[in-house]
Structure formats: structure tokens, C-alpha cells
A protein has these predicted regions:
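Mature-chain termini and adjacent capping regions
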Residues: 1-153
Length: 153
């Protein structure tokens, strides 16, 4: 009986907090408190103070700090789309690490901005330093793109 009330309370709490949550899922959202992680499936959305990410599946690891969950690593799978300021990053797989504030995308990667579209195999986006490294289809060919915050073109 206690388990029943615990499940009802948990579902009520999750439904009330869902709108304010940085993490949303269309099909399932599994919380693993022991391993401090979430697994989300179906129309996944993740938001933080830097970007918004969408994918078919996501695994997010977190730490608890002052009674809040701080997401440290977010891994996105299939149909990945990341909106950052005026840029949109797309790929098949992405991993974000909070410690260095870097997003790494792989597989049919693109960077789209109001003035350009770049494509390649791998993208490393350094959010703090406003730097993008795009690896083309050839593993040995690298293209580095520096974006100026005040650039008009």
C-alpha cells in the first residue's frame, strides 16, 4: 500500500513539475536515482541556460547541488537538433559536457546560421570560446570556423 501511494505521489509530482523541467519526453522518461541519470525517449527536449536540444532519445547524467539537479553530461541519439543563439546544429549523435561546455556532434553534421550552411562528419562546438571545428567527410580534413559575435556577414 505504501508503494502505491509513493507511485501516485511521484506521478503527481512529476506531472506538476513537467512544464518547468529542463527535460521533456514524448514517450518515456526513466529516472535512475541510484546512478543519477535520466533516460528519455520520443520527442525529447533538453534546455539549459545556453541552448535547447531535441532528439529521439537522450541519456542525461546529473549531480545534486543545493537540492537541485545539475546536468553534467547529456547524450543525444538520432535526429539531433541543437539551437544555440542564431545557429542550429544537426547530427545523428551528440554529447554535451558541462565541465568544458563543449558539444560534439557526429554523423551527417550541419551548422546553419542566417548567412551560411556548413556540412561535415563531425562538429565540435566550444560554446564558451565561440569556436567551431568541423571535420569534413575525410577524417584527415579539418575546417575551423570562427564566428564573431558582432559579425554582420
Amino acid at each position: 500500500m505504501i508503494k502505491f501511494f509513493y507511485i501516485i505521489f511521484t506521478l503527481l509530482y512529476v506531472s506538476l513539475a513537467y512544464d518547468k523541467s529542463p527535460l521533456k519526453a514524448g514517450k518515456s522518461l526513466i529516472w535512475d536515482s541510484e546512478n543519477q541519470s535520466y533516460t528519455a525517449n520520443g520527442d525529447v527536449e533538453f534546455k539549459n541556460d545556453k541552448f535547447t536540444a531535441y532528439a529521439d532519445k537522450m541519456i542525461a547524467k546529473y549531480i545534486e547541488k543545493q537540492n537541485k539537479e545539475i546536468f553534467t553530461t547529456v547524450e543525444l541519439f538520432e535526429n539531433v537538433k541543437i539551437e544555440f543563439e542564431e545557429e542550429v546544429f544537426r547530427g545523428n549523435h551528440a554529447i554535451y559536457t558541462r565541465d568544458d561546455n563543449i558539444i560534439k556532434l557526429t554523423g551527417d553534421v550541419s551548422i546553419e546560421s542566417p548567412t551560411r550552411l556548413l556540412t561535415g562528419y563531425e562538429l565540435i562546438a566550444d560554446i564558451d570560446n565561440n569556436k567551431r571545428i568541423l571535420n569534413s567527410a575525410n577524417d584527415e580534413s579539418l575546417v575551423e570556423v570562427l564566428l564573431d559575435n558582432n559579425a554582420k556577414n
